[in-house]
Amino acid sequence: MSDKHPGPLVVEGKLADAERLKKESNFLRGTIAEDLKDGLTGGFTGDNFLLIRFHGMYQQDDRDIRAERAEQKLEPRHAMMLRCRLPGGIISPQQWLGIDKFAQESTLYGSIRITNRQTFQFHGILKGNVKPVHQLLGRLGLDALATANDVNRNVLCTSNPVESELHQEAYEWAKKISEHLLPRTRAYAEVWLDQEKVATTDEEPILGATYLPRKFKTTVVIPPQNDVDLHANDMNFVAIAKNGKLVGFNLLVGGGLSIEHGNKKTYARQASEFGYIPLEHTLAVAEAVVTTQRDWGNRTDRKNAKTKYTLERVGVDTFRAEVEKRAGITFEPIRPYEFTGRGDRIGWVKGIDNQWHLTLFIENGRLLDYPGRPLKTGVAEIARIHKGDFRLTANQNLIVAGVPESEKAKIEALARDHGLIDDGVSVQRQNSMACVSFPTCPLAMAEAERFLPEFVTKVEGILHRHGVGDEHIVLRITGCPNGCGRALLAEIGLVGKAVGRYNLHLGGNREGTRIPRMYRENINEEEILREIDQLVGRWATERTAGEGFGDFTIRAGVVRPVVDPAQDFWD
């Protein structure tokens, strides 16, 4: 990942069609407002199909009934998925009750999906409810601007309820970074909130008239927890504290997990260390990284457009020097930091401010009223009495934060009564995660969310059989190679290849600092479980004291570590 063969700063050639679309969109307006009035189709047409992503929505359909509807000569059952902008994942109980009501009354699935980017998604919003949901968010003090497409997406922040003051400072920076890098266009306010058109010309001083070459993801991380998986992100601010107070950030740039099956020009990559900056330079440096990627990112090939590929093409040193020049700063040497894990601390923890925080494990992040487990109703009941806030975590869990001692018993009783606390959940299940995939994701190649629960049960059985039932392996399943489930930072990562078939990756670590290598390609569940059974058996008997499964697979030579992904990811 050093400057081996620096390439051109700008890639010349025919621009990808997405660049035309953005240029002609009139700063993201397109004809969305007119399309909303078209009752002949349940979807958005032409360029609007992609433009709505800048407004936080993806057009989807129910893939379980797609073929049936085609036979009936009907268009797919179009519905939108909406993703809220929620930097740092903090939401008030009052806001929660508003989104809970909408999910129940105005979506096809009646669920709220907590995502591993610390926000929530609604699935199954019919076209007639699209404008009302944006207006509801507006009334709640929320929005969905820039949670998808070629912009800086929802900014993550480590969920650290214990060190309350440090977390609050880091969270404030996550919010500031999010606001600073937002699109300036008034399109969102005009289309969804009916704000009047202003007779001034739109300008995008940071993102530019054609926005970024590709999506861009940012985190604020508080060591020793790497719950946000910084190496999956383009730009990362690692908090450096002195006496419990935030003093600055280490900057790491160029992480990303998305690949394309069989395309060896694509690869997962860890972020590179750029250096340390004091707090006062944070926004200038964030802007400089984004504008450098804006100007140098590949706009001719979207498969090669992310920051990680720009870094590899121009060289880390060249990119870093440009950021220094644009921000008017010089990076100081990286300050020491260490990650020890990335899972959430499930259950009650007490903060240094004497407030209590309850982390609820939500399998797959899916809040729905299941038979005998009315999870969604339970969270709403807690919201009705809770005086603190809710925090959505990057592990798809929910923290009831800021609970005084006097309210603890009441909130725990509500959580238990609604199935939100289950003492029988294993540590393995708590450390397993999947993306949404079927039936709503149009990119899904294999099951993920619906596959995970039963698959984890089988893995639990393997662990128990080998006498390591109290241990865990970071396990992630993603339904396609785009990386949403962050399987390419797991100790065991399954990447969907086709229905019922996955690529099996091994060799990540618990801290999330190593890319796992593909071990077996295109295998089914039975074959995957056979491989896991054999390897867990070896791990249980051959491991050193405290050695994690991923570290063992590297040391034992089961897989070679990915050292320089641009060169050896596919070896």
UniProtKB/Swiss-Prot annotation:
PROSITE patterns reported for this sequence: NIR_SIR (PS00365)
Entry keywords, A to Z: 4Fe-4S, Amino-acid biosynthesis, Cysteine biosynthesis, Heme, Iron, Iron-sulfur, Metal-binding, NADP, Oxidoreductase
Metabolic or biological pathway: Sulfur metabolism; hydrogen sulfide biosynthesis; hydrogen sulfide from sulfite (NADPH route): step 1/1
Cellular-component GO terms for this entry: sulfite reductase complex (NADPH)
Binding sites annotated in the UniProt record for [4Fe-4S] cluster: 435, 441, 480, 484
Gene Ontology biological process terms from the UniProt entry: cysteine biosynthetic process; hydrogen sulfide biosynthetic process; sulfate assimilation
One Pfam family named in its UniProt record: NIR_SIR_ferr
EC number: 1.8.1.2
Enzyme class: oxidoreductase
GO terms assigned for molecular function: 4 iron, 4 sulfur cluster binding; heme binding; metal ion binding; NADP binding; sulfite reductase (ferredoxin) activity; sulfite reductase (NADPH) activity
Co-factor binding details: Binds 1 siroheme per subunit. Binds 1 [4Fe-4S] cluster per subunit.
InterPro entries in UniProt: CysI (IPR011786), NiRdtase/SiRdtase_haem-b_fer (IPR005117), Nit/Sulf_reduc_fer-like_dom_sf (IPR036136), NO2/SO3_Rdtase_4Fe4S_dom (IPR006067), NO2/SO3_Rdtase_4Fe4S_prot (IPR045169), NO2/SO3_Rdtase_4Fe4S_sf (IPR045854), NO2/SO3_Rdtase_FeS/sirohaem_BS (IPR006066)
Catalysed reactions, semicolon-separated: hydrogen sulfide + 3 NADP(+) + 3 H2O = sulfite + 3 NADPH + 4 H(+)
Superkingdom in the source lineage: Bacteria
Sequence positions that bind siroheme: 484
Cofactor dependence: siroheme; [4Fe-4S] cluster
Gene3D superfamilies, per the entry: Sulfite Reductase Hemoprotein, domain 1 (3.30.413.10)
Subunit structure, as described in the record: Alpha(8)-beta(8). The alpha component is a flavoprotein, the beta component is a hemoprotein.
Family classification: Belongs to the nitrite and sulfite reductase 4Fe-4S domain family.
Role this protein plays: Component of the sulfite reductase complex that catalyzes the 6-electron reduction of sulfite to sulfide. This is one of several activities required for the biosynthesis of L-cysteine from sulfate.
Entries under PANTHER family matching the protein: SULFITE REDUCTASE [NADPH] SUBUNIT BETA, SULFITE REDUCTASE [NADPH] SUBUNIT BETA-RELATED
Protein name per the record: Sulfite reductase [NADPH] hemoprotein beta-component
Lineage summary: Bacteria, Pseudomonadati, Pseudomonadota, Gammaproteobacteria, Enterobacterales
